[in-house]
Amino acid sequence: MKQLILALTAIACAAPAMAQDAHPTLVVGTATASRGHKATGVIKVPAGVDAGYDIPVVVVHGAKPGPILAVVSGAHGTEYASILAVERLIDAVDPARLSGSLILVPLVNVASFERIIPHVNPTDNKSMNSRYPGDASGTQTDRASLAITREVVEKCDHLIDLHGGDLDENLRPYSYWTVTGNKAQDDFSRAMVLAFGLDHIIISADRPKDPKASRYLENTASTRGKPSFTAEAGRSGPVNPADVTALVNGVQHVLMHLKMLAGTAAPVARPVWIEKVVTVAADQGGMFWPAVDRDAHVVKGARIGVVTDYLHHQTQEVLAPESGLILFVRAVPSLKKGDTMANIGTIKK
C-alpha cells in the first residue's frame, strides 16, 4: 500500500511538469524535432497553375519549453547577407542550450536565388513579400505565401523577417517596427526591435490591419497578434561579413531578450526613429548617376543625382523631395521608368 501511495504521489508531482510542455515535438513542413534536437526538412509548395517547389526549413527544438521564434529570409533571393545570416544560425544555435524553439527558413525565393534575379520570383514575376497570407488557387508566389503562413506564421509566437539591399540597392542597415494599435503587443515588439540592435528604426504605422489582406510576412504575424518585426542589412550584391554578423548577433540578442538563450541583450541606447519614408522614383529611363551615398543627410531640394540618356546628355536632375536620411540609393546605373532611385527617411524629432 505504501509503495502504491508513493507511486501515485510521484505521478501527481510529475503531471504538472509534463502538462507544461505543449510541444514535446515540433513539426514544420517535413521537419520533425523532439525536445533537445534539431531537424531539417522542406515546406512543400504544391503545384498549381505553375510548378511547385520546396522551401528549406530547420527546426531547433530546445531542451526546455519556451516561446517559438521564427526567422525567415530570402523572400528576395539576391539579398544575400540576410540569407547567409540564417544559414549561420542553423549551426550557431544549440538546442541543448535553448528554452523554446527556433524555426529557421533561410531561402523562400529559391528561383530568384538560383537565377540571380532581384526583387521578384521569376516564375510569376511577383514579389514574395507582397502576397500574404497567400492563395491556394494563385500562382507560385501566392501558394508559397500560403504555405509559409500555415507552416511558419501559425506555428510561431514571434517572427523576424530578415532582408537587405538587393542587387541595385546601396542600403544602410535598419529595422521596421510595426505599430498595430495594440499597446501591449506594440510595446513587446518595440522591445524586441531595440534588443536586436540596429540603431535606425522605421516606424510603420500604415500597414494593412486586415489579417486576410496582410500583404507582408511580418505584418501577417503582427495582424495575428504575434509581436514581430523586420530587419535589413547588406547591399548591392557582394556580401560584407559585418552585415551578416549584425543580423546573426541581432537574432541571438532577441533570443536572449525572450529568455530563450542565457545572457543579456542591452537595448539600443540612442535609437534613431524614422517616422516616414519617401520614395524617389524615376519618371523616365536612362542612366542614373548618384550624387549622394547611403546614410547621407540631405535637405529638401538637395541634388540626389542626375539621369542621362545613353549619349550622356542630362535629362533630369533628381532632387530630394524632403529633408532626411538616405536609407538607400540606387547602386547601378541601369534605370527604367518607375525604378526607385532613393529612399529618404524623415527622422522623428
Stretches found by the model and what they are:
Residues 1-4:
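Positively charged n-region of N-terminal signal peptides that target proteins for export
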Residues 10-11:
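Short, linear, compositionally biased motifs with a strong N-terminal bias
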Residues 14-16:
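N-terminal signal peptide c-region/cleavage motif recognized by signal peptidases
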Residues 19-349:
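Structured catalytic-domain cores with a bias toward divalent-metal coordination
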